[in-house]
Amino acid sequence: MRVAVLHVELFIPHALSLKDKRMVLRRVKDRLGKFNVAVAEVEHQDVWQRAALGIVAISTTAAHVEQQLASVADEIDRVEPGLVTRTELEYLA
C-alpha cells in the first residue's frame, strides 16, 4: 500500500473576504471529489488571499498514486487557473 500527500498552496488575489476564499476552495474541493482523494484546508485558514490544501491518495502502487495526484494538480489548475503557487508531493508509506 502506498500513501501520498500532495500539499498545494494557492494565492487568491480576487478574494476580498474569507467568504470569497471559501467559495473558491469549495469549487476546487467539489471538482476533486471525482478523484477519490481526501482534501482538507491545512494552513492559512484566517488569511483571505492564501490557502493551503492537503490532498491524500492511497493505492497499491506508487505509480498509480503519483499519476492520480498529478491529475488532481492539473484539475486544480483547470478549475482555478493561475492560483497555484507551490506543490509538494510526499510519500508516507
Roles of regions detected by a PLM:
Residues 21:
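C-terminal binding/interaction regions
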Residues 3-14:
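Short glycine-/aliphatic-rich beta-strand segments at the starts of folded cytosolic domains
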Residues 36-43, 83-89:
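Short beta-strand elements
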Residues 11, 33, 37-41, 53:
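Amphipathic alpha-helical assembly/interaction segments
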